[in-house]
Structures are given as structure tokens and as C-alpha cells.
Amino acid sequence: MAIFTGAGVAIVTPFKEDETIDYERLDELIDFHCENGTDSIVICGTSGEAATMTECEHMECVKFTVERTKGRIPVIAGTGSNCTKTAMELSKEAADYGVDGVLMVTPYYNKATQKGMIAHFTQVADAAKVPVVLYNIPGRTGCRMDAETVAHLVNHVDNIVAIKEASGDFSNIAKMMELTDGKLDLYSGNDDQIVPLMSLGGKGVISVLSNVAPKAAHDICQLYLDGKVKESLDLQLKALPLIHALFLEVNPIPVKKAVELMGLCGGTLRAPLTELEPEHTEILRREMHHFGLIK
């Protein structure tokens, strides 16, 4: 059974002005998502600025999220690293805290071979024990998981069960689905490609959009799963201007501004990320207004 179906939020991490984690606002965000249609919380991923967290902060954030979610919706922890040993340690600790799964990005910078990725993910999955969601995002990592690599892992490692696909390579994704024969749960990693990915057998999305429009992201997925493909596509297309505004600069710069504009939490970013440019802020504000998120 899938860890979740629908829209999981790639949740932002609220920081105070001094850049410490704002756990009070994170608690409020967790309640917001549990009450507004989000199907899963994915903590400490790209949108959560995990790359600029210490390992101690990372694990404290995971532990807090599991405790505060209280089983209302599944929690998936980003525990990826380009160091296999570190990824193993983070994944095991997250599993000990009670996460429902871990999200594991391909080893970045090292540019591992396909053989190296198989070794990496096999070792990490063995340490984690909980379900593993692979994360293919070559635009950030510098390496791509081939369909055959994904199929080998899914077919040989019992707890590697899903993939977040942000490559945009639909031919490779289709091949993955063919080679795994129903054993791979596919999630879109791109909000503007939810419906296309679901047409290949996808279960939903791990979403930036969900940070500000959780019901819309959920509805795009659920309508498709209910066989209402036209309605799903219509909502996907309606959301495109907002989605594009959320990616005017590198994620999570725009979405951090968006949650600030909605009053959900502060927009503080950790360096080297910098505040959204004023002209982009105005575009974002306009699209949020058009979508009914702010006045």
C-alpha cells in the first residue's frame, strides 16, 4: 500500500529573524496542513532548506514534526546525503522517531555511477527499515537515475517502494513504470506536471504548491484518482500561473515569500538564499490574489 495518495506538502521550515527554527510557527503549519487537505507532510527536503541545517537541527525538526502530527497524516523525512554513511545514520534516526518513510535524493556532487547509486540506496534502505522514496532531480544533483537502476532497486530491495520524479524525462519515467510492473509508487516532483505524471500511473505529488494551496493540490490528484480527468486537468491548468510564480526564482525563495504574504510564517531564508526580488514579489502577489489566497 502507498505511503500516501494525493498531495504531500514539501513543507517549508519557518525560521525566526535570527535564523533559528521557529517551532511555534512550524507547529501552526502542521495543524494548517492537517486541517486543509494535505495528504502527507514531507519535512526537511529541498523546500525545507535541509541543505543549510545542521544534522542536529535536521533531526530535531523531524522528531518535532512526528510528535506534533500525532498520526493525523503520514510524515516522510528527507534524509538524503551524498555521503552514504550520513544518509544511513539520518534515516535510521528518523525511523526511530516514527516517520512513515524517508525521502532519499540521489548522491549529489559526487556524480555517482548507476552502480554506485544502487550500492548507496541499498545500504541506506537496509539501515532505514522504513519505506524509502527515491528522489530523482538531476537539475540539482548533477546525476540522473536511469529506469533500469530504479527497477533494480525496487525489484531487489523490499522497502524501496516509491520515487519522487522531478526530472521531466517522461520517457525514462514510463520505462520505470514498465520495468517495475506495478511495484513502484510514482509521485510528481513538479507541480506543473501532476496530471501528466498521474497518466503514467502516479499516486500524486510531493508539492511546493501545497504550502499555500493545499486543497487545490489535493483536488488535482484526487479528481484524477476518481476518474475525473477533465476536472483534474482544468484545475491543474488554472493553477499554472500561480505555480509558475512560485518558481520565478530558485525554490524555496518564492514559496517562503508566499507563506509570509499569507501570514502563515515568516519569510526568513538562510544564506546563501536571498529574499525574492521586488518585481518577482509583485508577480507572486498578483497570482496569489487571482487564485484567492490573499486580498
Model-derived regions, located:
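Secondary-structure boundary/capping positions in well-ordered alpha/beta enzyme cores
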Residues: 72-73, 131, 160, 183, ...
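Short, amphipathic alpha-helical "lid/cap" segments that border enzyme active or binding sites
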Residues: 23, 27-30, 147, 281-288
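C-terminal alpha-helical cap/extension of soluble enzyme domains
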Residues: 6-14, 36-38, 199-200, 206-295
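Glycine-rich phosphate-binding "P-loop"
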Residues: 136-137, 159-160, 270-271
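Active-site beta->alpha loop and helix N-cap motifs at the rims of alpha/beta catalytic domains
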Residues: 2-9, 13-142, 152, 294
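A general structural signal for well-ordered alpha-helical segments in protein cores
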Residues: 26, 58, 62, 87, ...
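Helix N-cap/beta->alpha junction signal
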Residues: 83, 190-191, 277
